[in-house]
Amino acid sequence: RYMRVKMIVAYDGTNYCGWQIQPNGITIEQVLNEHLSRLLKEDIKVTGASRTDAGVHSLGNVCMFDTNTRMPAEKISYALNQKLPEDIVVVDSCEVSDDFHPRFSKSRKTYEYRILNARFRNPTRRLDTYFYHYPLDTEKMSEAAKYLIGEHDFASFCSANSQAQTTVRTIYDCTVSKAGDIITIRVTGNGFLYNMVRIIAGTLVKIGGSDMPADAIKGIIAATDRAAAGPTAPAHGLTMIGLKLSLIHI
């Protein structure tokens, strides 16, 4: 009897070349496959909901795999966490129905991009926060963020080497908040294009640190041209907070 197992995985992406297996570096997917295969004594291949880029962190990526093991699904996380490197943790594991698939599910994904806006670096936040020392107008950034909400063609916010069939996405919420020296850009959407959240962050930083008006975002969206938006903010400031999946029955 085989079962399908869903896992929620948190990781510090600093030392990894992203989620997806690739020939020239170690990835989260590869580490999970190796440890699961060893633990369950069979060849395991996980499928992730979100293929985060190199250096990007996660508090709740979702993946699944099929197995013939007799080990109860909820015990797998405990057994795995004893063997995994300290920068990867399986937060939860459970059995799911055969029609569950993280890629073909409707999802709401939430990302946070964190900026340390201060005169000096903070060495304790260097791995998960982008240091930017020029003053930023968070009120204006917050106002600009509201224009991103809704269904739009986000071609301006997509890296040129994206393989997406369509650049239309829906953003449900986009906020900018400040606590102390840390500015947090929080974005929830139904899916994101390649580097989209980092380009949104870079564009909001450009608006917040210049005399560009908040509603410049409208023109940037309308241009559907990557050159119209701001720079791609560095990967290490980005954390995938989590995602909610609901099944689409095909």
Predicted regions mapped to residue ranges:
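Structured-RNA-binding interfaces characteristic of tRNA pseudouridine synthases
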Residues: 2-247
